[in-house]
Amino acid sequence: LICICSPQNPTGRVINPEVLKGICDLIVAENKLRANQVNSRPLYLFFDQIYADLSFGDNFVNPIHVCPEIRDYLICADGISKSLNATGVRVGWIFGPKDVIGKMAEILSHIGAWAPKAEQHALSRFIDESYDEYQSHLTYVKDEYEFISNEICGKFQELKDKGFRVDYQKPEGGIYISIYLDYVKSFPRTEDYISFLINDCGLGIVPFEYFGSKQKGWFRISIGNISSLNLDFIKRTIEESVKKSNVLVNSMVF
């Protein structure tokens, strides 16, 4: 099983169509070889597209778009908790080869991991009766998130141009921005710097180390609760956090 998440968490990056096609072509070719082998199981692609409805512009590409032959080996996961800003509503869906979906349903029924029935019915009715409104909501949310992302990234570029030890990576979708704060390297532990930002600056971020990264300095900042109403306040908070970090680190005795 090969797993891909696009747009990705925490970076918000969308997989390049040519790269995705290359992966799909290899999977198809591998399965053609396995078809002639006794007791050989297929190689599947698990494609997590939970942030797809929040991708900016035309960046998002599903494996089917670039390699129709992958259909027999593709398992796609999606849901509404991200696109509707309803992270507490864990209702999603999977589509893929019939035998695989059947096995997944059996396992879920045994461990009792179904989404609450009331929420399933509510979502089904909502999509049936309010599909146009849902699409309008998505258009509004994507435009809002893209605008906010550009503004936040612009603030980090401004700070970077002034010589502060920061960097960023502009997202292509989702609700997160990747930021780099070199100041963390002056702290004994990443957690110490996070505590400083929360307690002294009012800024909460998540280090990439929590996602398995070995590189110290990169963090994920969420824009899920940012709107045009509080954007200026958030930008000031970011600037003050960076300036306080700079002052503190420069005053440290090594």
Spans of model-derived segments:
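Alpha-helix termini
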Residues: D25-P42, V66-E69, Y131-E133, Q157-F164, ...
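Structural signature of PLP-dependent enzymes
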Residues: M104-I111, E129-C153, S186-F187
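PLP-dependent enzyme catalytic core of the Aspartate aminotransferase-like
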Residues: C24, S186-F187, F196-I205, F211-F254
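Helix-loop "lid/cap" segments that line or gate small-molecule binding pockets
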Residues: W93-F95, H121-S130
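Active-site PLP attachment segment
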Residues: D53, N62, V66-M104, A115-E119, ...
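Conserved glycine-rich beta-strand-loop-beta hairpin in the small C-terminal domain of fold type I
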Residues: Q120, S124, L138-C153, R165-L181, ...
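Active-site phosphate-binding strand-loop segment of PLP-dependent enzymes
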Residues: L1-D58, V249
